[in-house]
């Protein structure tokens, strides 16, 4: 019985870790997009850089 509980705890911690690492690139994209917006440019998510809006 203790083994099952331990297994559940380990998997839930791993899931939480996976979710947080999954979310951080999204946050980075938002930050980068905001930086590009301040320069009057558009954000290219594929190449992760600021580009002129009309070229995209």
Curated annotation (Swiss-Prot):
Pyrrolidone carboxylic acid modification, residue list: 26
Statement: the UniProt record of this protein carries the keyword Lyase: no
Signal sequence coordinates: 1-25
Keywords for the protein's UniProt record, in alphabetical order: Amidation, Disulfide bond, Pyrrolidone carboxylic acid, Secreted, Signal, Toxin
Example GO molecular function: toxin activity
Record flagged with keyword Signal: yes
Tissue: Expressed by the venom apparatus.
Protein name (record): U-megalopygitoxin(2)-Mo9
Compartments, as annotated in UniProt: Secreted
Protein family according to the UniProt entry: Belongs to the caterpillar 2 family.
Modification sites for Threonine amide: 55
Top-level taxon: Eukaryota
Any one annotated GO CC term: extracellular region
Post-translational modification: Contains 2 disulfide bonds.
Role, per record: Probable toxin.
Main localization of the protein described in the UniProt heading: secreted
